[in-house]
Amino acid sequence: MRIGLVGAGNIAGRYAAAIAAAGELELAGVTDTASGRAEALAAEHDCVVHPSLAALLADDGVDTVVNLTVPQAHADVTAAALEAGKHVHSEKPLALRHEDARRLVELAADRGVRLSSAPATLLGEAQQTAWKLVREGAIGRVRAVYAEANWDRLERWHPDPRSLYEVGPLVDVGSYPLAILTAMFGPVRRAQAYATTLEPQRTLLDGTPFTPGAPDFVVAVLEHADGVVTRLTASFYVGPCRQRGLELHGDTGSLHLPTWAEADSGLFVQGRGGDYEQQPLLREPFPGIDWARALVDLADAIATGRPHRSSGEHAAHVVEVLEAVEGSVATAAPVDVGSDFARPEPLEWAR
């Protein structure tokens, strides 16, 4: 699968390296609106630099676009790529509004191309092992989940995180555990939430002050179709430490993933009243995050005609959940969620 990157910012290098390491994938081109960024990435990874999005989309040597632009541009860039007949994998969120996300899903179907979206951390070894244990009843019926998405103060390391502070931690990192949990326990049907800004004045590494455009602390209670209740916390104030994991609590025990992000997370199970014990993963895990895993799955799905796992429909549902949380914050009332999606299949080695 020949890939064109749109956006050569903070995570583009990680995608490019992962694509290079995957035999099924080829980095065919890159474009970026910021002068010099695409050229630097292309020099390191030996690919074509396109002077514009239009030029990349006109290149027959690119069949799949990976959208790595800022969240505010995701919907427009993805729509342009789909209109051009390209398959698309978008960084999260698929769009900032559910209406736009649904429109992208419909456009992909109309054009006969695939629409995939991050996050794809569900495909990691630790996450797949946890899902298998849940399906097999290792902790009984799951009724409650604690999900932590605390990402500290991005301005301490990110060169310019202002676009991320405009959408806030709910959208930027809350979508990761949401994608995993909705795959495991089905769509969310109702959301109720609280949010505030803990640190209203921030400063970039170069000394430039800025003000976040969205709350930097969000707590949401989500009711899933399967009856599970999730408490999700997302923050750009609290550091991760032990605050970046998933706890699944069932009738006969509990399961803990210290991090939902990395494929090589530890995995611990506690029987009722017992101690947490580390569990073996189903296979040797990838170290950290495999940024190309959803792309490898997409390439295989296109080649074999099966559904890909990180689907646009699933991503659009996550967008509606995020929108419902924001609506609940604004109204101080519960907000219903109506969309659905076909749940992904476990990976072959995790069935």
Feature map (PLM): residue ranges:
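Beta-strand-loop-alpha-helix segment that lines the small-molecule cofactor/substrate pocket
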Residues: 64, 70-71, 75-122, 137
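Hydrophobic residues in well-ordered beta-strands that form the structural core
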Residues: 51, 67, 89-90, 115-117, ...
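Contiguous beta-strand/loop segments that form the cofactor/metal-binding neighborhood of enzyme cores
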Residues: 179-263, 292-306, 340-351
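N-terminal Rossmann-like dinucleotide-binding module
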Residues: 1-45
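Predominantly a Rossmann-like dinucleotide-binding segment in NAD(P)-dependent oxidoreductases
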Residues: 121-211, 332
